[in-house]
């Protein structure tokens, strides 16, 4: 599942399915909406010609990732998973959405106080840790240990990481 940066959509899609961007979400809100637009569209066309120039602003949310953008991304992916389950198509997107959740929750693994939250977010993501292209081997090992009740290994890895970086 790729990401559509821009597009032209029929107004009737928004009206017929009561689609709108989620309020209060400033990161991944376009992905939240485009998934639904593509799902409900009877036809999707890809035009290989630029119609506008995408400008990245230095002050944009893409350049200022923080705890709120992390939470937004996690919420968006959880809501898309819920949507796919409601539509009865989650099995078709399970692997891709689990990969996205692993990427979105990787920061949680680096702080012991967040381990429970990591484990609770989409429990079936543990089946896709090793083949997820978005995270490095050390994080994969840490995630695998956490999801398989081997948190003592994760704690050891976390302490070694802190020691290596001069933080105690």
For the regions a language model picked out, list residue spans one by one.
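Catalytic core of nucleotide-sugar-dependent glycosyltransferases
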Residues: 49-58, 63-89, 110-129
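Membrane-interface aromatic/basic loop that binds lipid-linked glycans or pyrophosphate carriers
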Residues: 111-168
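Short acidic alpha-helical/loop segments enriched in Asp/Glu that coordinate divalent cations
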Residues: 56, 93-96
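Conserved nucleotide-sugar donor-binding catalytic segment
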Residues: 1-67, 73
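Inter-helical turn/loop segments and adjacent helix faces that build the functional surface
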Residues: 23, 87-92
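Short, charge-rich amphipathic alpha-helical segments embedded
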Residues: 30, 105, 130-132
């Amino acid at each position: 599942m790729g990401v559509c940066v821009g597009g032209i959509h029929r107004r009737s899609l928004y009206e017929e399915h009561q689609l709108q961007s989620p309020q209060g979400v400033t990161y991944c809100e376009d992905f939240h909406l485009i998934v639904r637009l593509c799902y409900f569209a009877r036809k999707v066309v890809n035009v290989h010609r630029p119609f506008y120039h995408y400008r990245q602003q230095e002050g944009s949310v893409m350049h200022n990732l923080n705890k709120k953008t992390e939470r937004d991304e996690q919420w968006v992916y959880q809501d898309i998973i819920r949507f796919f389950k409601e539509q009865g198509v989650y099995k078709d997107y399970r692997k891709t959405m689990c990969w996205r959740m692993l990427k979105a929750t990787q920061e949680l693994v680096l702080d012991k106080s967040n381990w429970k939250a990591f484990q609770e977010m989409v429990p079936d993501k543990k089946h896709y840790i090793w083949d997820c292209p978005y995270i490095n081997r050390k994080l994969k090992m840490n995630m695998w240990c956490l999801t398989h009740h081997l948190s003592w290994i994760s704690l050891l890895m976390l302490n070694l990481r802190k020691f290596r970086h001069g933080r105690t």
